[in-house]
Regions:
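Glycine- and aromatic-enriched membrane alpha-helices
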Residues: 1-431
Length: 431
C-alpha cells in the first residue's frame, strides 16, 4: 500500500459532493419544465433516485460495478463487496477505508464518488416519463435498474470489462475505447432507458394536441446552472487525482458548454426568431453531456467544436418526438441521447493522437461507434425487460383522472402552490 495522498482524497471527495449536487440540479431543471400540477412528483422522484440508489450501492451495486471478481467482463461478483465489506474496516471501533487505490486515496472515497454517478444516471430517466408515473413503481424500477443495468455497464466500461480500453472490443479493433466520464455509461444509457419506458407506458393525455409549457422557467435556469457547477466534479473529478488533467477537464468542459449554449441559441433564433431562456438552459446541458466522454482527450479548439455541433444537433433532435410520435416529456432522448452519442463518436474524429482529424486513423472511430452501439443494445434490452415486467404486474401509470387532475395531488397528496389556501387565510385575517 502506498502513502495516502490527502490532496487527491480531498479533491475526489469534493468532486463526489459536486456530482451529488447535480441530482438536486436536475430536480430544479425538470421541476421547472413540468406543469405546476406535477412539480412535486418530479422532485420526489429525484429524491428517490438518490435514496434508493444509495441503499442498493451499499448493498451490492458497488460490488457488481467495481469490487467483485469479473464475470466474463460483464459484471462483478455481488458477494465480494456486499455491504462494502471489501472497502471498509473497523480500526479500534472506528470505521475507515480498507485500502488505498492506485492514486493513493482511500477506496471508501471511490465508493462515495461512484455512488453519485449512479444516482445522477437514473435521475435523468424520470424526465422522459414525467406527469404520469406512479412513485411506487418508480422506486422499484430504480432498484432493479441500478442492479441489472447501470452497475454491469459501469463494470464493462470503467472496471476493465468488455467495453473498456483494455477490453475485448478494444483489443479486437486495435484501439482503446474511451469514455472519460460517462458518454455511454451515463448519458446514452439513461436516454435509451428513457425511450424504452416511454414506448411501453405511452403518451400523456393531450400530447400533440395541448401545449405542455414549463411552469417555472427560473427553476429551469437554476437547475442548469447547478448542473454546470456540479459537472466540474463530474468531469474534472474523473481524472481521479488533483492534477493537470483535472484542470484541463474543467476548462474543456466549460468551453464546450459555452459553445453549445450559443449554437443552440443561434439555431433557435433561426427557427423561431427568439433566443429563449429554455433554449439557453437546454444548450448548457447539451454541451455538458457532449464533452463528458471526451473532456481529457480533445484540444481546446475541438472542445468548442464538439459543443457547437452538439448544440445544433440536440436542438434539432428535440423536435423529432412530435414527428415520430413518442412522448419524451422533457427531452431526455434529444439532449442526453443525441448529446452523449455525439460526444462519444466525435472522439473518433478529434481525440488527440487517435482521431481522424488529430493524428490518428479510422480505428478509434470504429471502436467508439461499436462501444456506443453495444451500450445502446444493452440498455434497451435490460430496461425493456424490467419496464415490461413492471407494466404487466404493478403497472406504471396513474389513472387518467389522476393524471388530468394532477399527479402531485393524486400521488403525493400535496400541491406545490396552494394559492386557494393562501387566499383563504388572507381573507380570514382581513375579516
Amino acid at each position: 500500500m502506498g502513502q495516502l495522498d490527502s490532496g487527491n482524497a480531498a479533491w475526489i471527495l469534493t468532486s463526489a459532493s459536486l456530482v451529488f449536487l447535480m441530482t438536486p440540479g436536475v430536480a430544479f431543471f425538470y421541476g421547472g419544465m413540468v406543469r405546476a400540477k406535477a412539480v412535486l412528483n418530479m422532485m420526489i422522484m429525484e429524491a428517490a433516485a438518490l435514496s434508493v440508489t444509495m441503499v442498493i450501492w451499499v448493498l451490492w451495486g458497488w460490488s457488481i460495478a467495481y469490487a467483485g471478481t469479473s464475470v466474463g467482463g460483464v459484471f462483478g461478483d455481488p458477494a465480494t463487496g456486499f455491504l462494502l465489506k471489501d472497502s471498509m474496516v473497523s480500526d479500534g471501533g472506528v470505521f475507515t477505508s480498507a485500502s488505498l487505490n492506485s492514486n493513493n486515496y482511500p477506496v471508501s472515497v471511490d465508493v462515495a464518488f461512484q455512488s453519485a454517478f449512479a444516482m445522477i444516471t437514473v435521475a435523468l430517466i424520470c424526465g422522459a416519463i414525467a406527469e404520469r408515473v406512479k412513485y411506487s413503481t418508480w422506486m422499484i424500477f430504480v432498484a432493479l435498474w441500478i442492479t441489472f443495468d447501470y452497475a454491469p455497464l459501469a463494470h464493462m466500461v470503467w472496471n476493465g470489462g468488455l467495453l473498456s480500453a483494455d477490453g475485448a472490443i478494444s483489443q479486437a479493433i486495435g484501439a482503446a475505447a474511451h469514455d472519460f466520464a460517462g458518454g455511454t455509461v451515463v448519458h446514452i444509457n439513461a436516454a435509451v432507458a428513457a425511450l424504452v419506458i416511454v414506448l411501453i407506458i405511452g403518451k400523456r393525455k393531450g400530447f400533440g394536441t395541448q401545449p405542455f409549457r414549463p411552469h417555472n422557467v427560473p427553476f429551469v435556469m437554476l437547475g442548469a446552472f447547478l448542473l454546470w457547477f456540479g459537472w466540474f466534479g463530474f468531469n474534472a473529478g474523473s481524472a481521479f487525482a488533483a492534477n493537470g488533467t483535472a484542470g484541463y477537464a474543467w476548462v474543456s468542459t466549460s468551453a464546450a458548454t459555452a459553445a453549445a449554449m450559443l449554437s443552440w441559441g443561434f439555431t433557435e433564433k433561426i427557427r423561431t426568431g427568439h433566443y429563449t431562456a429554455m433554449g439557453a438552459a437546454s444548450g448548457i446541458v447539451a454541451g455538458l453531456v457532449a464533452i463528458t466522454p471526451a473532456a481529457d482527450v480533445v484540444s481546446p479548439l475541438w472542445a468548442i467544436v464538439i459543443g457547437a455541433i452538439a448544440g445544433v444537433l440536440t436542438c434539432l433532435a428535440c423536435g423529432l418526438k412530435f414527428k415520430l410520435g413518442y412522448d419524451d416529456s422533457l427531452d431526455v432522448v434529444g439532449v442526453h441521447g443525441v448529446g452523449g452519442f455525439t460526444g462519444t463518436v466525435l472522439i473518433g474524429f478529434f481525440g488527440e493522437g487517435t482521431g481522424l482529424f488529430a493524428g490518428g486513423d479510422w480505428k478509434q472511430l470504429v471502436v467508439q461507434l461499436l462501444v456506443a452501439l453495444i451500450a445502446i443494445i444493452w440498455s434497451a434490452v435490460v430496461t425493456g425487460i424490467i419496464a415490461f415486467a413492471l407494466e404487466k404486474t404493478i403497472g406504471w401509470r396513474v389513472t387518467e383522472a389522476q393524471e388530468v387532475g394532477g399527479i402531485d395531488l393524486a400521488d403525493q397528496g400535496e400541491r406545490a402552490y396552494d394559492f386557494a389556501g393562501t387566499a383563504s387565510s388572507v381573507l380570514k385575517e382581513v375579516k
